[in-house]
């Protein structure tokens, strides 16, 4: 089966926190039924099955998931957009909305507020060095 994941979520409406959590489960599972999403969600937090089914229906309406053709009566879902591209768009929205468009402010906040390991800091240094030559 061909990869049907769309490359860009630019025209899709933003996700609520609950939709983000459910979408994370769908991305992790790949193709899945609502019962699998419910089971996975309830490992960390209890939520009514009907609520999760409603969230899945809303994600479908928004274009984040699509139905998988099946002969069974149960709906099966798969991601319609990639996690990476939704993450990039979400980060761009965060940078422009909360940090005045400044990546420097985002990185400053991240470094000051999070406990970054030496390994994480070294990886950030390498990324910065790579970008310095590109003029970005």
Give the label of every model feature segment.
Residues 32-40:
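Short acidic, hydrophobic short linear motifs in intrinsically disordered regions
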Residues 63:
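Glycine-centered, phosphate/nucleic-acid-interacting loop/turn motifs that mediate DNA/RNA or nucleotide
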Residues 25-33:
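Short capping segments at the starts of secondary-structure elements
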Residues 86-134:
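Amphipathic alpha-helical dimerization/coiled-coil segments
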Residues 53-57:
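Short, hydrophobic-biased segments on the C-terminal half of alpha helices
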């Amino acid at each position: 089966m061909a990869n049907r994941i769309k490359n860009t979520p630019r025209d899709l409406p933003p996700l609520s926190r609950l939709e983000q959590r459910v979408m994370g489960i769908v991305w992790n599972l790949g193709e899945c039924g609502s019962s699998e999403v419910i089971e996975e969600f309830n490992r960390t937090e209890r939520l009514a099955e009907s609520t999760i089914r409603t969230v899945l229906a809303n994600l479908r309406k928004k274009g984040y998931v699509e139905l998988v053709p099946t002969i069974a009566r149960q709906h099966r879902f798969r991601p319609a957009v990639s996690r990476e591209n939704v993450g990039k768009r979400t980060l761009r929205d965060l940078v422009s909305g909360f940090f005045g468009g400044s990546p420097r402010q985002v990185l400053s906040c991240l470094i000051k507020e999070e406990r970054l390991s030496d390994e994480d800091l070294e990886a950030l240094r390498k990324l910065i060095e790579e970008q310095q030559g590109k003029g970005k």
